[in-house]
């Protein structure tokens, strides 16, 4: 196979490949023979139709299919030989066969390479690891906060304040034209403690029942509602009800009996374990994010536009599916945020981890994978069903394999960099602005 490689400024990488005409003609002949065996044409017995007649009847369509298959076959042989990792779908271009005397057909393929990346100065990277100390008093406070209480919401005739529960109706307009399909009634939420857009929270403060509020927002280009994408939408909000919370001890929690101490002890241990588990997940993720961020700061890592757009589309599909499955509200904050930062974060992590795996020739340890499966399955009512599912499902096996490889790669990174420990108390952990690291929150 003959090929010629070049790099275009705008079109990415390009390779020109030559396919011998004898290869094309032989493939065509084999296809014509297959058709003759299975197709009956008027005037000829089945299997006896002359190749010339088959060629005249089916030639154009078959030639296109055969040449398409050969172009793909030769191109993927080329990337295998050159050990090239491509992104997305390559674009094929057939050259005009002006010189009939040539012994080959010529075509070009434009493709984008997966970024090549070398990690430098890894030992110079410094990050902070947060260690959180939880005291018995912290756990007792947590039990007290989460023990069985009955919340009563009492309607009030006062202005809306933070942490009030508010019920609203709303409708939306584009260029003063109402879009009726998005009308919503009786939407309740707790002010300043919800997952809705910030504009709603601060616009509604200090208003009263029956007040009508207007505000305008521009919907994101990747909002799940295609009809609203990139549009300036005006919301008309009417406040239906304002309520304030009153906490009451339930009858159950007021009963003092012999079993209460056992229950408290059980709650104590469960809450202690849960707190440690959640804190470890959040602080480990925080540490890993620092590592990736520091590596990107010290090393030039350019994300190919094709790879970036591909990941944007994947994330948009995930968001749209989630939006539909959860029957989400158009006011949900996460659907109004740019996908760019999340996509960059994902791709940086993916590229760096893959480079660590490649450089260190890491392989998935089956024993560790089995431990991981057992750990995951223990969270389900029927652990054996999860284990059986893993053994049967190829995609799940690949996912577990990738998780194990990522774990090994991240462990190597942690051993290579400088980690400075920071000791926090539980209160500092709770009051830290984790909102700037929303992906960490469980």
From Swiss-Prot:
One GO MF term: peptidyl-prolyl cis-trans isomerase activity
Please give the Pfam families that the UniProt record associates with this protein: Trigger_C, Trigger_N
- The EC class name is isomerase
Q: Does the keyword Isomerase apply?
A: yes
Q: Where is the PPIase FKBP-type domain?
A: 163-248
Q: Which Gene3D superfamilies match?
A: 3.10.50.40, Trigger factor ribosome-binding domain, Trigger factor, C-terminal domain
EC number(s) on file: 5.2.1.8
The record, for InterPro entries, names: PPIase_dom_sf, Trig_fac, Trigger_fac_C, Trigger_fac_C_sf, Trigger_fac_ribosome-bd_bac, Trigger_fac_ribosome-bd_sf, Trigger_fact/SurA_dom_sf
Instruction: Write down the chemical reaction(s) this protein catalyses.
Output: [protein]-peptidylproline (omega=180) = [protein]-peptidylproline (omega=0)
**Location of this chain's protein in the cell:** Cytoplasm
Q: Which GO terms describe its biological process?
A: cell division; protein folding; protein transport
- Keywords tagged on the record: Cell cycle, Cell division, Chaperone, Cytoplasm, Isomerase, Rotamase
Its main subcellular localisation, reduced to a broad class, is: cytoplasm
Cellular component per GO? cytoplasm
Give the source's domain of life in one word: Bacteria
**NCBIfam families (alphabetical):** tig
* Protein purpose: Involved in protein export. Acts as a chaperone by maintaining the newly synthesized protein in an open conformation. Functions as a peptidyl-prolyl cis-trans isomerase.
Report the family membership.
Answer: Belongs to the FKBP-type PPIase family. Tig subfamily.
Q: What is known of its domains?
A: Consists of 3 domains; the N-terminus binds the ribosome, the middle domain has PPIase activity, while the C-terminus has intrinsic chaperone activity on its own.
What protein name is recorded for this chain? Trigger factor
């Amino acid at each position: 196979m003959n090929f010629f490689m070049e790099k275009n400024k705008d079109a990415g990488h390009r390779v020109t490949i030559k396919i011998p005409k004898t290869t094309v003609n032989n493939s065509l002949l084999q296809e014509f023979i297959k058709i003759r065996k299975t197709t009956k044409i008027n005037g000829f017995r089945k299997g006896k139709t002359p190749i010339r007649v088959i060629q005249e009847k089916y030639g154009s369509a078959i030639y296109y299919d055969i040449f398409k298959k050969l172009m793909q076959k030769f191109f993927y042989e080329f990337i295998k030989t050159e050990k090239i990792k491509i992104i997305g779908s390559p674009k094929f271009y057939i050259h005009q066969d002006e010189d009939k005397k040539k012994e080959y057909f010529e075509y070009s393929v434009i493709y984008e390479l997966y970024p090549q990346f070398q990690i430098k100065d890894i030992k110079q990277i410094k990050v902070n690891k947060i260690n959180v100390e939880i005291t018995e008093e912290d756990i007792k406070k947590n039990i007290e906060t989460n023990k069985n209480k009955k919340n009563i919401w009492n309607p009030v005739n006062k202005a809306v304040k933070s942490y009030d529960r508010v019920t609203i109706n709303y409708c939306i307009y584009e260029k003063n034209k109402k879009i009726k399909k998005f009308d919503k009634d009786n939407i309740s939420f707790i002010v300043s403690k919800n997952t809705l857009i910030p504009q709603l929270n601060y616009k509604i403060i200090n208003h009263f029942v029956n007040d009508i509020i207007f505000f305008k927002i521009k919907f994101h280009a990747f909002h799940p509602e295609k009809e609203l994408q990139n549009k300036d939408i005006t919301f008309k909000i009417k406040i239906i009800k304002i309520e304030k919370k009153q906490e009451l001890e339930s009858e159950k929690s007021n009963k003092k009996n012999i079993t209460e101490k056992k229950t408290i002890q059980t709650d104590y241990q469960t809450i202690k374990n849960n707190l440690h588990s959640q804190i470890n997940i959040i602080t480990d993720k925080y540490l890993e994010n620092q590592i990736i961020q520091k590596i990107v700061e010290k090393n030039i890592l350019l994300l190919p536009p094709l790879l970036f757009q591909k990941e944007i589309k994947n994330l948009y599909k995930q968001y749209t599916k989630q939006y539909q499955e959860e029957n989400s509200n158009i006011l949900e904050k996460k659907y109004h945020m740019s996908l760019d930062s999340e996509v960059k974060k994902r791709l940086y992590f993916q590229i760096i981890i893959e480079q660590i795996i490649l450089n260190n020739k890491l392989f998935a340890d089956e024993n560790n994978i089995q431990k991981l499966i057992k750990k995951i399955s223990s969270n389900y009512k029927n652990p054996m069903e999860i284990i059986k599912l893993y053994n049967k499902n190829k995609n799940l096996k690949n996912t577990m394999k990738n998780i194990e490889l990522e774990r090994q790669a991240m462990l190597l990174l942690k051993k290579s960099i400088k980690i400075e420990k920071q000791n926090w108390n539980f209160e500092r952990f709770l009051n830290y602005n984790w909102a700037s690291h929303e992906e960490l929150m469980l």
